[in-house]
Amino acid sequence: MKERLQKIISAAGVASRRAAEEFIKSGKVTVNGKTAELGDSADIDTDIICIDGQTIGRRADNTYIMLNKPRGYVTTLSDEKGRPCITDLIKDVGKRVYPVGRLDMYSEGLLILTDDGDFANRLMHPSHEITKTYHAWVNGKCSVAALDRLRSPFDIDGYKTKPAEVEILYSCDDYTQLSISIHEGRNRQIRKMCEQTGLKLTKLKRVAEGKLELGALKPGKWRVLTEQELQVLSEENR
C-alpha cells in the first residue's frame, strides 16, 4: 500500500515527519534510485527507499526497551563468575535483546536494549555524541574548584574528553548530589573524572540519554520505548 514518504520514514524510526520532509526537500531521499520530491508516495514492501544511500525498512519486528538497571548487576547476557546479569531482569521480554552501551556493575539507571543492530550501532557511534546525564553522589561538600575541574576536559585512557556539564542538585555537610552530562561513553568515565578530581563517588545513576529520560521506572523494571521516544532517539543519532 502506498503512503506518503514522510510517513514511511517516520514509521521506520529514522526521523520525525517534519525531519523527514526536510530530508526529502534536501534531496537526500530516493525511491528506486530516483530522487524523491515532497508529496511523493511509495510502498515500503515493494519500493526501495533510501536516505543518504541507506535503505530503510519496517521497524515493527524489532524490540526496543529501557531497563532501570539496579546496582550489583553486570551489563552482559551471561557471566562466567556467576554474578547477577541483566538477563535475569528481562526474561519476560520475549525476544533476545542486547544492551546498547554499558553500565558498570556498581552503577545503576537507564539502559537501552534492542534486537535492532543498526539502531544500536548508530546510537553508540562516537560521531553522534548523544549526551548522557548522570546523577552522582560524592562525599562531603563539593568545592568550586572541584566543580571547575569536573567541567574541564580529562585525559582518560589516552583520550581527551570534551567538557562536561555539571550542576549541584543538593549539598550538605555529608554529601553532594551532582548532575553530570557527558558527550562520550568512555569506560567508567565519570568514576575516573571524580577520582582525578579527588572526590569519593558513592553512587552513580544514569537518568537520561539525549532526550530519553528514565523517569519513574523502578529499579529492576523495564518497559517498551514509545514510538515518540524512538523517533527522538533516531533524530539525535542521525
Please tell me what each predicted stretch does.
Residues M1-R238:
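Basic, flexible Lys/Arg- and Gly-enriched helix-loop patches that mediate nucleic-acid binding at interfaces
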